Amino acid sequence: MNHFQRNRFLFHLLYLMAPRVSEVSSHSMNSFRLYRGQWWWFVLGKGEKQGKIPASDEMLGALMQYREHLGLTPLPPEDDHSPLLRSISGGKGISANMVYRQVKTVVKEAAESIKLDNPIQASILEKASTHWFRHTSVTHGDDAGIDLKYLTRSARHEKIETTAIYQHAEDDLWHKAWQKLKF
């Protein structure tokens, strides 16, 4: 296995599923399951709380490509208890710390590649982390018009108020309106 394929899957997972880093490292392939004719990611998260998140076609495509690269069937059977993210050297899983370090390495390289042309974006990107992708996923979900109750369930937040923190559309409108004020 090479880093590219694992990283491609990892970044799809981080952005499209909004997981906590511990969820990324602790789950097996069969946590992606067909339920009532649709694919979901079944998660045991913070506080041992069970949750499920819809797996979009894009997420399934990334999962299938990653699994095929590993020499596995495109979609995981129920008995596939192998780690969701594998070490480069074989079938063992990787730790939450390794997931975090891998993300930091990739975003640092990406930031470095745009630094000359776009130093402000580079400095923002350099600060990205696994949790940043979780926040970004929920924020972009809100921007895309996904209902707050679905965002709350996908983020596995106890309270809808926690998820509401990620709603920035009002700030954007306010900022745009404020531009009308001229000296």
Residue spans of the language-model regions?
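Conserved catalytic core of the tyrosine transesterase superfamily
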Residues: M1-F183
